[in-house]
Structures are given as C-alpha cells and as structure tokens.
Curated annotation (Swiss-Prot):
<dbReference type="InterPro" id="IPR002885">
    <property type="entry name" value="Pentatricopeptide_rpt"/>
</dbReference>
<feature type="repeat" description="PPR 3">
    <location>
        <begin position="310"/>
        <end position="344"/>
    </location>
</feature>
<dbReference type="GO" id="GO:0003729">
    <property type="term" value="F:mRNA binding"/>
</dbReference>
<feature type="region of interest" description="Disordered">
    <location>
        <begin position="88"/>
        <end position="142"/>
    </location>
</feature>
<feature type="repeat" description="PPR 9">
    <location>
        <begin position="518"/>
        <end position="552"/>
    </location>
</feature>
<feature type="repeat" description="PPR 4">
    <location>
        <begin position="345"/>
        <end position="379"/>
    </location>
</feature>
<protein>
    <recommendedName>
        <fullName>Pentatricopeptide repeat-containing protein At3g15590, mitochondrial</fullName>
    </recommendedName>
</protein>
<feature type="repeat" description="PPR 7">
    <location>
        <begin position="447"/>
        <end position="481"/>
    </location>
</feature>
<feature type="repeat" description="PPR 5">
    <location>
        <begin position="380"/>
        <end position="410"/>
    </location>
</feature>
<feature type="compositionally biased region" description="Acidic residues">
    <location>
        <begin position="107"/>
        <end position="127"/>
    </location>
</feature>
<feature type="repeat" description="PPR 2">
    <location>
        <begin position="276"/>
        <end position="309"/>
    </location>
</feature>
<feature type="repeat" description="PPR 6">
    <location>
        <begin position="412"/>
        <end position="442"/>
    </location>
</feature>
<feature type="repeat" description="PPR 8">
    <location>
        <begin position="482"/>
        <end position="517"/>
    </location>
</feature>
<dbReference type="Pfam" id="PF01535">
    <property type="entry name" value="PPR"/>
</dbReference>
<keyword id="KW-0809">Transit peptide</keyword>
<feature type="transit peptide" description="Mitochondrion">
    <location>
        <begin position="1"/>
        <end position="71"/>
    </location>
</feature>
<keyword id="KW-0496">Mitochondrion</keyword>
Amino acid sequence: MYSLSRILQRSQRYNFAPSSFGAVSKLEVSSGGDKERVFKSFGLIYSKPQGLVRLYSARDVFSRFFGIHKLSSIADAKDKGDEVVREEELSESEEAVPVSGDVPEGVVDDDSLFEPELGSDNDDLEIEEKHSKDGGKPTKKRGQSELYESIVAYKSVKHVLEKWVKEGKDLSQAEVTLAIHNLRKRKSYAMCLQLWEWLGANTQFEFTEANYASQLDLVAKVHSLQKAEIFLKDIPESSRGEVVYRTLLANCVLKHHVNKAEDIFNKMKELKFPTSVFACNQLLLLYSMHDRKKISDVLLLMERENIKPSRATYHFLINSKGLAGDITGMEKIVETIKEEGIELDPELQSILAKYYIRAGLKERAQDLMKEIEGKGLQQTPWVCRSLLPLYADIGDSDNVRRLSRFVDQNPRYDNCISAIKAWGKLKEVEEAEAVFERLVEKYKIFPMMPYFALMEIYTENKMLAKGRDLVKRMGNAGIAIGPSTWHALVKLYIKAGEVGKAELILNRATKDNKMRPMFTTYMAILEEYAKRGDVHNTEKVFMKMKRASYAAQLMQYETVLLAYINAKTPAYGMIERMKADNVFPNKSLAAKLAQVNPFKKCPVSVLLDI
C-alpha cells in the first residue's frame, strides 16, 4: 500500500525546489470522442464550513519528515532609467521584424502540464494505433484528418467548414476530435476555438462534456479566465461536470491565480465531485511556485482521501528532490515507485539521469543512459529525444554526433528538435542549423517548435541578427506570429542587452491585437529592469501585467522590491499595495520589505532620536 509519508520520510529537512514543470495546462479528455512575517497564512485541508483551512501546524505530521522552504519571488516619474527607447531609435530593419500575423496563434505556453498523466505522443501529430505483435510498446501512425489538413492548408476555419458542409462531408465526433487534437499539437489554439464556435452556431453537432471542457480551455488560452468563467455558466448543467471544472482549475494555475484556483477547488468540493489526482497535481504545481508551505497540505489531503499518486505526482516529487540536490531522497521515491509497480520508463530514467549529472554523478547518469538506449535505437528510436540532451549536458559530443546521424537516417520530428537543442548546448550552432534545415525539407506542414529551438540557441549566443532573420523567415513561411513568437523575440533582445527594445517590440505587438503576451514574457522584462534598479520601468511593466489581467502575486512584488533595493530607494506604501492585492509576504518577501522600509531607523539614528 502506498504512503506519501513513507515517500517523503528522511532525517534531513525536505527542501521543495521549484518544479521543472511549467505553469501550463493541458486538457485531459478521453480519446474516444480525446506558494517571519505574514499578514495571514492558509493551509489547504478542506472542511465544508470554512473551505480550505489549515488543520495542521508546521510541527504536525509531515514536519517530522521534511521542512518547507517558501518560494523566493507609484513609480517616480522622474526616474526614467536608461532603457526608455523611443520608437524612432529603431532602424528600419528592426521595424521589419513581424510582430503580428494574419492567423492568430493563441496564447502559447508549454502545453505539457504533468504530461505523462494526460498522455503524450512519441511523435508529432501521431495517434496510437495498436500494440505491436510482440506485446511491446504500442505502434504509432500519423493521425490522418482531412478536416485538419484542409484547415491548415487554407488557414481559414470558416471557409473550410462552410465548404465541408456544402459538400456533405462527415463532421462526426471522431473527425472533429482528431482535427482539434492535431491543431492543439500545433499550438493553433485560436483555430481550435473557431472550430468549436462555428460548430455550435451552425450545426446540430452534439457536444459532450469533454467538448465543452475543450472549448472552455481554449477560451481561457485565447482570451482570458474571466471569459472562460462566463462561458462556464453557458454550458448546459448536464455537461457542467468535474472535467469542465478541473479544466478551469488548470487554467487558473496557468495564469498564476492562486486565490481563484483555490476557489475553484472548493467549488468542486461543494458540488461533491470526487477529488481527483489531476486536481491535486495542479495544486502541487501551483504551490511549488507560490506557497511551498501548502505543498504538505496537498500531500496530506491525498493521503486522507486515499488518492493514489499518479506517475505525474511522482515526477513532481522527483523533480523537487532532484532540484534540491537531495539524491538520497530522490532514490527513495524511486524505490516507492518500483514498489507500486510503476515502470521506470525512459522518461523517468532521463529525469533521474539529469539530476545525477547536476549532482556531479556522471557515472551513474551514464549507466542510466545505457539502460535508456536498451536493445538499440532501431527498436526504440523515440529514446533519442531523451538521450541527446543528456549527452550534451555531460559534453559528450561524440555520442551526440552518433545519435544525430541516426536521427538523420530515421528522421522523427521530436528527435530532430532534441538534436537541435543538444547541438545548441554544445555551442555548435552550424550543426544545429543543419538539423533544422533537414527538418524543413522533410515536413511540409511545419510547426513552430523547431523555430523556437533554434531561436533559443541564437538567444543564448547573443546572435541578434540571426534571431531577427529567423523571425522574418517564420513570417514569410506563413507561420503564425503570436505570443510565443513575441516571447522569443523579447528573450533575444534582453539577452543582447536591449531590454528597452524588447519592451518596445512587445508594445508594438500588442497594439491593436486582441491576444495578450505570455506571463513569462512580462516577467522576463520585469526581472531585467529590476536587476538594473530601474524602478520607473519596473513599476510600469508591473502595471501592464495587471492591465493584462495577470493577478499580482508574490513573485511580481518580490521582483518590484528588488528594483527598489538595487536602486537603493525606499518603497512607500508597498505593504498597503500588497494588502489591496490580497498578497501576503513570505519570509523572503518580508526581508525585502524591511530593506526598503522608508521609516526604518539605523542604530545610530535610534541613539540620537531624543
């Protein structure tokens, strides 16, 4: 019988390091139809009259096994800073970089939240067909969808659907679901939403709860959480089930809305929905970024309600232990996984190898990498995507080259992406470009991920000109320019030391554009201004985030306070601002508040204060 207490038991303190999982959401649907001074402190154990309340003190139960380390995360108009860039300062060539496109891209984040739990493909645009004859890993084939192919070719959902109906073609649940699935894999969220909206307005298509959940997820991604909440009320009561609510919960995590996520979780309890491991995993992810003290409460809740950890839960725990450098604790979790009968697949093995490398245990990592390769690449070609970055991490260019040659002979989309990234880690830009070009030649319907993989290499090597040229190439190739592309450009300019131009590009992109930038895009600019002690611009970006409906959280306020600290400027009214935003400081934030307290007295001033 599994026990979360046993999983986390150890003599030392348990340090929950940040999870490697991004704050993102991925809809879980069936394939059949597919975060010492505080103002206030909450825990998570649920009770009906009070909702989420703390029932255990820091010394109760789980404190025997681990300690909890919380997350560390009106401008003066005269303080303009050095990074205010006038629009005319940009050259014509810079203005030529596309910042918008004809086809909306939607809010693009890493769509892989607890992916092993929700299902992940071993190749792009593939679906599971059947198990191999020897009873091994299921074989895959490319998901053929005429509707999807037509939409991508015409880049017009309305045109294709009108023609589709006129010709009397099938708009079955299976065809629509597969088209939505493939469009999601391309991050074409706006197109997915248009498809659902058109079906709802122009046909008698019978929507299932999973269909409504998919549409709600897309409304939140393309528009906002507020609009998603409005859409929720429009869903027929019979289809307003647990799947729909947990989809909204996942998007609250994506948007970093802690209070709203807790409200949704409580609402699901009030509606007497069973507490799912998916919902608990979402809260674990949320609190890993915003309030680590509550992580123990989630784990206690799972134990109290007999919710068995999923593979994704174990992934989270392994990442927490690994990032904290607790290799012994990580290995104890692995033992528990084995006791539970969960197979250590290549994905889990690659995560373990990654943390062995970080801990300097190169030989252990290499042993695991040999296990991952197993009987040979011909039998398990998909393991290249895990092995390539690992060999790059230990600087083994020979094995990276060996695997890259195999990838060339047996081109798979995911393996090619990993090869590009591996060569980037080794600073072999030309090799990465060569893999990219071969991928361009192979795929006619070319997703954005390879462009972003190559853009990341240009960013890390401060190759501004090449990065800009790549974005132009994306535009010329008909690739949708949207939030994810803006994010790549912003990172490129920030890394090159041009944060002012990065902000200007973002301002241009969002002008007259309904799509909003990603949370991480704003944070990249906010953090750079804060590092420079540019209070004015830091506050300006902070307000932009609020206007873009990104709720003020601990990490934003901590970054703003860092700007005041670096500028050696007192911050007036900061505590009141935080109270107004319902943000309560943890230990790290409280320390920063003390540093910028305008009424703080030094020891000498106290002596002379008579």
